[in-house]
């Protein structure tokens, strides 16, 4: 058995995990918060260690975003470094996956942000992509993270 983690490092990013629980596939998705990310990854790393499971993460490879400016690019890079630091510290293997690569896997290259939400609804219809109970709009960051976890399950 394995645990697959997907990480969308954007400002409205998220983290997701796909794992097995007594033979049943489960999915966990959480919005972005630095401390939540640490506890999320640590919980799954502990689970993997206890059960002799492998754990791997697919992290979206980030680059400069046109129109973000210098401060925005710096913060984006700082966040990406934080993610890699946490995964390395917890000894969770990871790969940086360019957006075009994982999107090609789900045939959504060049489509708008709602495309990943539609993929998740098709693959995991019971999973909520609402950041909070009060939200009405599904999070494309949570959908991207779940797609990255699904990509990891298929390819890593």
Task: Specify the residue positions occupied by each region the protein language model found.
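Phosphate- and other anionic-substrate recognition elements at nucleic-acid/protein interfaces
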Residues: 1-156
């Amino acid at each position: 058995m394995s645990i697959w983690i997907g990480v969308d490092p954007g400002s409205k990013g998220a983290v997701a995990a796909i794992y097995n629980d007594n033979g049943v596939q489960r999915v966990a998705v959480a919005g972005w918060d630095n401390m939540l990310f640490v506890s999320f990854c640590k919980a799954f790393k502990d689970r993997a260690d206890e059960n002799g499971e492998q754990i791997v993460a697919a992290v979206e490879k980030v680059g400069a975003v046109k129109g973000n400016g210098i401060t925005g690019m710096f913060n984006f890079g700082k966040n990406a470094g934080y993610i890699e630091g946490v995964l390395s510290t917890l000894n969770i293997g990871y790969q940086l996956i360019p957006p075009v690569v994982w999107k090609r896997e789900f045939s959504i290259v060049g489509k708008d942000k709602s495309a990943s939400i539609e993929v998740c609804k098709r693959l995991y219809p019971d999973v909520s992509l609402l950041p909070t109970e009060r939200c009405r709009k599904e999070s494309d960051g949570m959908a991207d993270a779940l797609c990255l976890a699904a990509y990891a399950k298929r390819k890593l």
